[in-house]
């Protein structure tokens, strides 16, 4: 039987900024990998039925061992977890996950309509289950009456943000020049999981590929630098396609572990909650 709510966990990143030789998703945090902790949260939310982990080729066996570990399988049940090969860029990985979901649905002679997908980063492994459930619920509410087609968690921007430019000619050539200061009251930092109507996210991805004249099959196979315009989250694709998405206040624990400093902060949080 196919799922009504899927999750895709992006875990193919190298994590060089974190300072470990191991890819970021597989770095241990207080004895449990970031990937396992992110799956713990998805399962505990009781909102996700099936999760697909997207990894690089060299970490596929490691990921398979993690998701097939009997203790993990029991811990995450009834949510099921499987592994698929991701891509060179985040977009490629998520698109590969969407293709995998479509294969499952086609095999069962079912369609994407009425289903949802939550796209999550393994690096946001402390995201509270209650927040995940709230984002899924908000997406469901909008799709039910066609008011919106997805929901994303967002965090306030506390710093003053500057738009900059780097002119290559003129008196300021070689300098970083401040162009403008947007009002931070209207700015938010996007977090994950981002939850969408499955059919609409597939459509948004296909529109993006058509716009850039890249075939779907080529997109799945690409490795390395992408010729596509940079897309750093899935809500951006929904925006481009004209599908409304609403924002949900995120819990600060939905922080992304990217640098060594982030890692130390996460350790302190866990030491306080698990001690």
Swiss-Prot record:
Site-annotated residues for Positions MEP for the nucleophilic attack: 184, 256
SUPFAM superfamilies reported for this sequence: Nucleotide-diphospho-sugar transferases
Keyword field contains Thylakoid: no
One Pfam family, short name: IspD
Enzyme Commission number: 2.7.7.60
One of the protein's GO biological processes: isopentenyl diphosphate biosynthetic process, methylerythritol 4-phosphate pathway
Name recorded for this polypeptide: 2-C-methyl-D-erythritol 4-phosphate cytidylyltransferase
Top-level enzyme category: transferase
Catalytic reaction equation(s): 2-C-methyl-D-erythritol 4-phosphate + CTP + H(+) = 4-CDP-2-C-methyl-D-erythritol + diphosphate
Top-level taxon of the source organism: Bacteria
Site (Transition state stabilizer): 17, 24
Physiological role: Catalyzes the formation of 4-diphosphocytidyl-2-C-methyl-D-erythritol from CTP and 2-C-methyl-D-erythritol 4-phosphate (MEP).
GO molecular function, one term: 2-C-methyl-D-erythritol 4-phosphate cytidylyltransferase activity
Pathway: Isoprenoid biosynthesis; isopentenyl diphosphate biosynthesis via DXP pathway; isopentenyl diphosphate from 1-deoxy-D-xylulose 5-phosphate: step 2/6
Family: Belongs to the IspD/TarI cytidylyltransferase family. IspD subfamily.
Entry keyword set: Isoprene biosynthesis, Nucleotidyltransferase, Transferase
């Amino acid at each position: 039987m196919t799922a009504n709510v899927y999750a895709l966990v992006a875990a193919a990143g190298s994590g060089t900024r974190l300072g470990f030789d191991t890819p970021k998703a597989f770095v241990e945090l207080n004895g449990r990998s970031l990937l396992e902790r992110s799956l713990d949260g998805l399962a505990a939310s009781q909102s996700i039925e099936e999760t697909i982990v997207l990894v690089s080729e060299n970490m596929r066996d490691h990921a398979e061992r993690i998701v097939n570990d009997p203790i993990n399988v029991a811990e995450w049940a009834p949510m099921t977890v499987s592994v698929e090969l991701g891509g060179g860029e985040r977009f490629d990985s998520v698109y590969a996950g969407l293709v995998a979901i479509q294969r499952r649905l086609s095999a069962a002679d079912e369609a994407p309509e009425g289903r949802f997908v939550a796209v999550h980063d393994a690096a946001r492994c402390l995201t509270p289950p209650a927040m995940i459930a709230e984002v899924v619920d908000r997406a469901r509410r909008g799709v039910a009456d066609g008011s919106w087609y997805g929901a994303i968690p967002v965090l306030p921007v506390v710093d003053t943000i500057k738009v900059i430019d780097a002119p290559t000619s003129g008196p300021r050539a070689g300098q970083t020049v401040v162009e403008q200061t947007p009002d931070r009251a209207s700015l938010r930092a996007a977090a994950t999981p981002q939850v969408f109507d499955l059919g609409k996210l597939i459509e948004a991805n296909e529109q993006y590929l058509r716009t850039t004249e890249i075939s779907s099959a080529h997109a799945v196979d690409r490795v390395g630098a992408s010729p596509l315009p940079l897309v750093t989250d899935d809500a951006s694709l929904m925006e481009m396609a004209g599908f409304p998405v609403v924002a949900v206040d995120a819990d600060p624990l939905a922080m992304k572990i990217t640098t060594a400093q982030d890692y130390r902060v996460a350790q302190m949080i866990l030491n306080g909650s698990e001690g």
